[in-house]
Amino acid sequence: VKGLWPFFVLCELVVRPAIAQSWTPQTSNTSVALRGVSAVSERIAWASGAKGTFLKTTDGGVTWTASVVPGAADADFRGVIAQSDKSAYLLSSGAGPLSRLYKANDGGVKWDLLMVNPNPKGFWDGIAMWDPLHGILLGDPVNGRFDIWTTSDGVTWVQQKGPPALPQEGAFAASNTGLSVRGAHEAWFGTGGVSGGRVFHSTDDGKTWTVSKTPLRHDSENAGVFSIAFSDARHGVAVGGDFMKPGDAAGTIAITEDAGKTWAAPAMPLPGYRSAVAYLDATKMWIAVGTSGSDVSIDGGRTWRPFNKAGYNAMSFVGSIGWAVGPGGMIAIANGW
């Protein structure tokens, strides 16, 4: 078998179709920092960012409409979950009442304020939806426990008893992918800080949690697990590092093959801090983005190849088409991966 390995590698190179691995910039019509993006289809996507800004396209990004949520110019929308060209959630992150959750059902003309963080010391980090009605929201620890909220109707959110946090442990609001869901009930989220670098896992809609350690660096409040994604029920990738050291490859990636019970670092790390990772089911590829560049893997995250040097914060894919967003209103499309 060992002697056949070069043959298998050659076959992989021959049968795998050529893939145009690149981001093509688009015009966002805004200059604010963008942190969230959510693709609905090949034509419909939403994005979000600072100063109460949200964006939408219905023509594949040929045109993006940028708007500000009325009365929310102070909001930093770190997360967006789009459900159609009409319906979307916006999550703002900030201390106490600066953490808010909005929803639109009319394409973004009117936004309903669903919830304001009731704790002045709280800070919301991310939101994810299992389906149009069932979702979960994650916040930094309050009184020693992570702040977990869930919904079963898409409108009313109920606070759960979150899992206990270690001292100086928290989550990150860098790309709205530090919280990840799969199937009908499973959720994972990553942590950072000097006690962080851990991944929590729930199989019952966020009611109870188990936790595991990862090899991602967590030697400062700036370092830890920033993003998690799964390709199936067992195989996942977590990325991160230290966002203050964007070119440092130490502790930037971990892989699990048992649904997050254990995590291991591959032999090849990512070349620097990465804030988001995504799996493209259509092409069986993994993509990672961060402030120092983008990378692609075709072997489950074990090895990576840089393909773009621009700095992006977040990304979202539908099939083989997706968008990435970044500082200064940066937005780009990857088409036909």
What are these regions (language model features)?
Residues V1-L4:
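Positively charged n-region of N-terminal signal peptides that target proteins for export
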